[in-house]
Amino acid sequence: MDVLSILLILVAVGVGIFVGRQFLGQKQAPAPTYQPVPSPQILEEAKSKAEEIIKEAKEKAEVILKEAKESAEKIVREAEEKAEKLIREAKEEVERIKEEVERRKKELKEREENVLAKERHLDRRWEALEKREEELLHRERELKDFERSLERWRDEIRHKEEELKHMKEEVEELKKKELEELQRIAKLTLEEARQEIIKKVEEEAKKDAVKLMKVIEEDAKRRAEFEAKKIIATATQRLAPQIAVNYTTTTVELPSNEFKGRIIGREGRNIRTFEILTGVDLIIDDTPDIVTISSFDPLRREIAKEALQRLIADGRIHPARIEEVVDEVKREFDEKIRKIGEETVYELDLHDINPGLYYYIGKLYFRTSYSQNVLLHSKEVAYIAGLMAEELGLDAKLARRAGLLHDIGKAISHELGGSHTDIGVELARKYGEPDAVINAIRAHHEEEPVRYPEVALVCAADALSAARPGARRETLEAYIRRLEKLEEIVKSFKGVANAYAVQAGREVRVIVNPEEISDEEAYLLSKEIPKKIEEELDFPGQIKVVVIRETRHVEYAK
């Protein structure tokens, strides 16, 4: 039984008792002697009344129950809403706490990583400092050894000078004796005897001086060459330079041979427009699916190649479109050139160079000297000079700066005309470069003396970069003319029987007439020939001069 049924029964029982009592109170006789029996009508009325009361009670109970139920539902709903709200807030709080914990964990992890990174950085710095300290100690020991060597050289030179002085005294004594002997013989006049003695003494002194000079020079060369090779080897072993290749043509692949006719155009209008705007020659031959771009200017070739590739990809090839594409590519290449210069400056860690020089530095990438890319050559010179400066304790940054800019005039020398050194000096002054850079621009072609030690390193690095095997190449005609000119210069000296340029012009062997040239004169000739070659011939790298004097004595056994 549910609660409603129980309530209805209780209400019905109560109503019945109440009605019965009312009925009994109204119908009771004053003093009856017998128990009256209610009539059916009365019972029917009581029953009807009871049913009404029960019905009203039931309705009231339903209303009360409904209100109680609604109130209970409302309370439950509010409780559920509050519970959901509390649960949601609790979940949000949990999520927030989780996020906070994760964030804290992440921060702690980042801090730990930063601390570890700093520790590793400090360890590397400490190792570098220890290594640098060892290098400095090693360098200090080497310098001390070098100082001791210098002191020994000075002692040897002083000893040689004393020997030379003693020899001069002996010569003077010999002159006096010969003069007395000549006067005694009286066959010559005093003046003639004096001239004869002077001639003999000069020859003897010249021979002795040449011998002494050779000994001192060979010793100094040997020691200096050892130190120089050591420094140069340390600098150059860290480079991987490129081999020069002389390209004057570039090829562009075509989707099909049909494009050759479209590139030529009606009556050749397209190809003429393209060649006029780009300054190159388009070679269209029987080679399948290939067009060749020919020009001695690398920048023009690159612009023409890019423009032609865009025209082929676009498919619209006519004079107006060609002009539009070529102009667009030229504008893009100006920015590309500046970007190349900027990247080069940052690669060499020269951030304080005036941005106005970026364009000229980038333009060196499209210039060549003896088929060697000028920008790559300048970077190579900068690296070698900087490394040698570090080895010698000089300003490595200044050496790299001067090395990079020593050929900056070549960027526009073909446009303005004139010497690239003068143009380079003008650019360096315009953009506020230091005096050492200007000195390097002039001194590497010996137009002015070297005034800074870093500039001397730049000149040496320039010679190394140009002289290494594979660095530069010449055209065949220029190469042959240079070898012929080299042999002509050598043959112009008196006593030279023949001359042979070998090793691709990097060595010349001089055969002298032994009857006209003595050993001492051959030695002096080996000094004079290189000077004249430097004055009259323009050549890459260096040329070794070998003077050969051969004496043959032939006899026959009979």
Swiss-Prot record:
Residues 248-311 form the KH domain. Pfam families: HD, KH_1, RNase_Y_N. Its EC number is 3.1.-.-. Its main location: membrane. The chain crosses the membrane at residues 3-23. Keywords: Cell membrane, Endonuclease, Hydrolase, Membrane, Nuclease, RNA-binding, Transmembrane, Transmembrane helix. GO terms for cellular component: plasma membrane. The keyword Membrane applies. Belongs to the RNase Y family. Endoribonuclease that initiates mRNA decay. This is Ribonuclease Y. It comes from Aquifex aeolicus (strain VF5).
